[in-house]
């Protein structure tokens, strides 16, 4: 296994792991002991889906959300700098795409650390695939706000 920050896609919903993630992903995941995650509980659940025998208590989790400072993120990467592979796990789908994982990737790249995205489901790409629209001119403007007034404003600006 190469030394890198691995971007680990997560299944969407209750989809069985083996129907959407290649065996290579499982191999990589089982070689990682340090994970930067959006939510520790859901990350632990995902890892147990990957391998029921995984020793969750032997793993280290670093929480990443909109409140995590760049300084904290930089510190999270210490195991990688010291020679241990790390993984980034989002709530669902691909980390770093319309996701706080993008901040981790940017900081890792500034530190000249290797970043390896793994194959997996992306709600954004799946929606384009199923839409019938031409993917050549696709543009993603981000997820719309939940608050109705903010959402209306966002739609006007688009």
Task: Enumerate the predicted regions with their spans.
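Conserved small/polar residues in nucleotide/adenosyl-binding loops
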Residues: 156-158
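Short glycine-cluster motifs
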Residues: 82-139
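Alpha-helical segments flanking ligand/cofactor-binding loops in enzyme cores
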Residues: 26-27, 77-78, 102-106
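Glycine-rich, flexible N-terminal cofactor/catalytic loop recognition
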Residues: 1-64
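Structural signal for short hydrophobic segments within the conserved structured cores
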Residues: 6, 62, 116, 139-142
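Conserved helicase motor
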Residues: 63-68, 144
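Glycine-rich, highly charged phosphate/nucleotide-binding loops
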Residues: 67-76
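Active-site glycine-rich loop that binds ribose-phosphate moieties when present
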Residues: 147-154
């Amino acid at each position: 296994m190469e030394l890198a920050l691995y971007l680990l896609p997560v299944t969407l919903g209750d989809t069985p792991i083996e129907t959407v993630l290649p065996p290579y992903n499982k191999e990589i995941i089982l070689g990682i002991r340090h994970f930067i995650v959006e939510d520790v509980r859901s990350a632990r659940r995902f890892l147990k889906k990957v391998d029921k025998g995984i020793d969750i208590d032997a793993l280290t989790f670093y929480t990443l959300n909109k409140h995590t400072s760049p300084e904290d993120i930089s510190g999270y990467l210490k195991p990688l700098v010291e020679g241990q592979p790390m993984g980034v796990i989002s709530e669902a789908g691909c980390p770093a795409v319309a996701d706080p994982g993008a901040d981790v990737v940017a900081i890792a790249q500034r530190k000249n650390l290797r970043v390896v995205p793994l194959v997996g489901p992306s709600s954004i790409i799946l929606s384009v695939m199923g839409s019938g629209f031409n993917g050549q001119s696709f543009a993603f403007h981000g997820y719309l706000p939940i608050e109705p007034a903010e959402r209306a404003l966002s739609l006007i600006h688009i």
